[in-house]
Amino acid sequence: MMLEVKDLNVSYGAIKALKGISFNVDEGEIITLIGSNGAGKTTTLHSVSNLIKKQSGTIFFEGNDITTLTADKIVRQHLIQVPDGRRIFANLSVKENLELGAFLRNDKAEIKRDLEKVFVLFPRLKERLKQNAGTLSGGEQQMLAMGRALM
């Protein structure tokens, strides 16, 4: 099991935003969270990443309990969100954007290997390495946001 969420409960004051949410994601599996505005999709993701406080519930990533880890430690576990709107650094190059994805890491050889993995997944980014990210098409910007998350 890659990600396991058990009995997640989140409240905003008196409003119960999540009530006992549980789900599993296996390696290689793709799931979707579907619901109307205010249904709790973003709250669920923010809870998993510990960007908001949970009242109760447990979260396991790759077999490790990450329920109480801080958001930066969760990122170090390689559990990353790529939000809507891409949120790239438009005035920086594609290369600089990708490098920012590895800012918490020190192992240069590992960073280089991960960069090559990104280029295998998104060869277009390698072609545009020196280009300003803001000049990429919308799809290319989404590739860049995902590539940065993989770094």
Short names for language-model regions:
Residues 57-64, 77, 110-115:
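Conserved ABC transporter NBD signature motif
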Residues 34-36:
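The feature captures the beta-strand-to-loop junction immediately N-terminal to the Walker
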Residues 17, 31-32, 81:
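Short beta-strand immediately N-terminal to the Walker A/P-loop
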Residues 3-5, 18:
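Conserved structural motif at the start of ABC-family nucleotide-binding domains
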Residues 132-136, 140:
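Conserved ABC ATPase signature
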Residues 49:
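Helix-to-loop junction immediately C-terminal to a conserved catalytic motif
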Residues 149-150:
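ABC ATPase C-loop
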Residues 13, 69, 94-110, 121-123:
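ABC-type ATPase nucleotide-binding domains, specifically the catalytic core motifs of the NBD
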